[in-house]
Amino acid sequence: MPTPHNSAKKGDFAKTVLMPGDPLRAKFIAETFLDEPKLVNNVRGVQGYTGTYKGVPVSVMASGMGMPSIGIYSYELFTQYDVESIIRVGSAGALQKDLKLGDVVAGMGACTNSNYAAQYGLGGTFAPIADFQLLSAAVESAKELGVRMDVGNLYSSDTFYDASNPSLKWADMGVLAIEMEAAALYCNAAYTKKRGLSLCSISDNILTGEELSPEARQTSFTAMMKIALETAVKMVAESQK
């Protein structure tokens, strides 16, 4: 059934959804990689499409920016549209010098400065982590595609312009990259007993100052998208065994 943020009908979304932040990137992914993509949502300009990839139904829908936004869209997909897996395909700022522009990282865990998990009333600190089966399928897909993919912790920040500039401290802890969505996705997946994974392509390096142009961010993340799509195919094949 439609929600205040999604006009799609039940059954319009595939079991696996790729979730970029930018609606224009969602459109690009659908039109570039999916066969017969159909627009199923455009509320607030947050575009959602469903098509097929190698004969497998796959959807792509934008999340917007930040944990509150992906928190809404991923929760509704999990609970109202029977989506089983959401793979975030976004951008991130590298916190390690050996990560180059365009490199792909997979968030095994998501450190955060957010209190998103406070809603669960836990008597401690919840550790948001990726679904192991999704992560394993992504690692296997990257190897098959010959794409380098670093796996480790991401740092999901509530603030883009952070006055305290904590990035170097997180880098000292071996965190690979900083972004703004993974922790909320992982929390929602855990709470709803579904699957979440965050793949990010490096758009800039916090330590070196290198960065991609806004235009390149939209279209240059082909390797990451192929890993995500091949992961979706593997998940369907696994479910049919």
Show the residue positions of the predicted features.
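Generic non-transmembrane alpha-helical segments
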Residues: 137-145, 188, 227-238
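Generic structural signal for well-ordered, non-membrane alpha-helical segments
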Residues: 19, 26, 66-70, 127, ...
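Short acidic/polar active-site loop segments enriched in Thr and Asp
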Residues: 83-84, 176, 195
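Active-site rim beta-loop-alpha module in soluble metabolic enzymes
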Residues: 125-174
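Zn-dependent metallopeptidase/amidohydrolase metal-coordination segment
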Residues: 183-217
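Metabolite-binding pocket within alpha/beta catalytic cores that recognizes anionic/polar moieties
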Residues: 1-128, 132-136
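Flexible, glycine/charged-enriched surface loops at secondary-structure junctions
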Residues: 35-42, 146-153, 235-241
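His/Asp/Glu-rich mid-to-C-terminal helical/loop segments that flank catalytic regions of hydrolases
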Residues: 206-241
